[in-house]
Amino acid sequence: MAEPEVLKGKLRLPVVGAPLFTISNPDLVIAQCKAGIVGSFPSLNARPTSQLEEWLDQIMSELKSHNRRNPEYPAAPFAVNLIVHRSNNRLEADLELCAKFKVPIIITSLGAREDVNQAVIGWGGITLHDVINQRFAHKAIEKGATGLICVSTGAGGHAGTLSPFAFISETRTWFEGPILCSGSISTGEGVLAARTMGADYAYIGSAFIATKEARAHEAYKQGIAEGSAEDIVYTNLFTGVHGNYLRSSIKQAGLDPDNLPESNPSMMDFGSGAKSDAKAWKNIWGSGQGIGAIQSVESTRDYIDRLYFEYQNAKGRICGCPYS
């Protein structure tokens, strides 16, 4: 793969921090980028739209300042996640702000929009579209997406059911552009595994919930740090799209996690006034299956430093030259 110009030589690790609905914020994104990975956030986390402009200004200003002070260790680029579903009545306004700030990476979800892709490429950015199967993957590329985020089984939040081995290898038979692997990755070994199976980058989300910078309730962070794969429930009840959630939070809501009804996908609403979806993600905690490797709440920098050591050490074990 020819690495996109906006990413070439700018990453300490081949990792993109996934946008976490209600949780990602400027502090987390800035910490991720300063530590050498792509940081991202959903535009809808900034409410109202005017706050999005404040967030973009803060992130860009702090990263530029960091780069001036640390020319030998520049920050990685950041990304904004846009929900392109027809119910998101903020899309046009949010896209205009991203254009104003020339956001380098746009992550698109829940629909493929040719006009959005063209706009981003027009200002020099790239678009990464998250997909759960080959039909959506082909559609995204046909609509002009730069790269694909293959959301596999076990991923936190909205997730698919395909094995990452099957998903990545099949996608690689027809697509030579950037591929990101999403699903249960929380260690440096997992990052290397994603690269080895054919992905260019690992996409990590749930692990960042248990960081000091994340805008999550302390009980949520502890739930990630103390949880395991067995604590994850896959359901479409809360947003109309299948996703993975912490069992304990479902119980706290007075529901039986083993007997949840099906939702009606036609009821999805991602508009700026959508209270039901925001409530679902606030009270019912999304999480992927890879949280068993997260043992404590720590700073974003410490977690990424550990990822880097694990990644280098795993490469060393494979080639017989231990990292030190």
Where are these regions (language model features)?
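Active-site entrance/lid segments in N-terminal catalytic domains of soluble metabolic enzymes
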Residues: 1-178
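Acidic, glycine-rich active-site loops and adjacent beta-strand->loop/helix elements
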Residues: 86, 154, 184-185, 207
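Conserved active-site-proximal phosphate/metal-binding subdomains
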Residues: 161-180, 186-324
